[in-house]
Design a protein with these regions (language model features):
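Conserved N-terminal diphosphate/IPP-binding helix and adjacent helical/loop segment
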Residues: 1-97, 102, 106-107, 113-141, ...
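All-alpha helical catalytic cores of prenyl diphosphate-utilizing isoprenoid enzymes
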Residues: 44-48, 62-70, 146-230
Length: 230
């Protein structure tokens, strides 16, 4: 029989959130931590090795943080659209964005072969080191790459689960879904155009502008603002 579905609700989510972007970021991180704890419990119920090797690694990766820029824009969009009072939905949307960003960064580091992320080994490097330490057979680099792709997929699954739960509980759920779907596709499109430009050696201005619009203007600014305003 399936066990109870993990929930991420907590008392702080129903309180009136602080009215500044930095305060909202701190509140979002508290929500994000509850989400992570719930997903880790689910991972442990699924498989102990998976939980220890992958879910715990992903949790540590997300907790290392970053600029949390998209969260700030989600909050600003909510406030600009007249948001006040209960901020639980907007904080959960911001947390979902941070999980989506984790997916994007993990996969980006695999594609670029980047050794570091946020002052620590990139996910594929960390997995490769674990492979070597365990004296497991086969290529450590190949294992690290494959495992990191799966970790990015897991981050995307966590992000989609959280956004779906939030949208289903919101009267504005259809608009949230619409913005989320568009943003995910634009994120992948921007990454592909970047990859394609590198492979072709293109330095055309219109190519660079298209990549900047997809990866930065829309994914980082416009869509988070629209998600908050939804």
């Amino acid at each position: 029989m399936l066990g109870p579905r993990p929930t991420v609700a907590g008392p702080a989510e129903t309180n009136h959130a602080p009215l500044t972007a930095p305060g909202a970021t701190r509140a979002m991180e508290a929500v994000l931590e509850r989400v992570i704890q719930a997903r880790l419990r689910q991972a442990r119920d699924t498989d102990a090795v998976f939980a220890l090797d992958m879910a715990d690694r992903l949790a540590a990766y997300v907790r290392r943080g970053g600029k949390r820029l998209r969260t700030a824009f989600v909050w600003c969009g909510w406030r600009a659209a007249g948001g006040s009072g209960d901020a639980s939905a907007v904080l959960r949307t911001g947390a979902a964005l941070e999980l989506l960003q984790a997916c994007a960064l993990i996969h980006d580091d695999v594609m670029d072969g980047s050794p570091l992320r946020r002052g620590a080994p990139a996910m594929h490097v960390d997995f490769a080191r674990g492979h070597r330490a365990g004296r497991t057979g086969g290529s450590a680099e190949s294992f690290g790459t494959s495992a990191a792709v799966l970790a990015g997929d897991l981050a995307l699954a966590w992000a989609d689960d959280l956004l779906t739960e939030t949208a289903l509980a919101s009267p504005h759920g259809p608009r949230l879904f619409e913005e989320w779907r568009a943003m995910r596709t634009e994120m992948v499109a921007g990454q592909y155009r970047d990859l394609r430009a590198q492979a072709s050696g293109s330095s055309a201005a219109d190519e660079a502008l298209t990549i900047a619009v997809l990866k930065s203007a829309r994914y980082t600014v416009a869509r988070p603002l629209a998600l908050g305003a939804s």
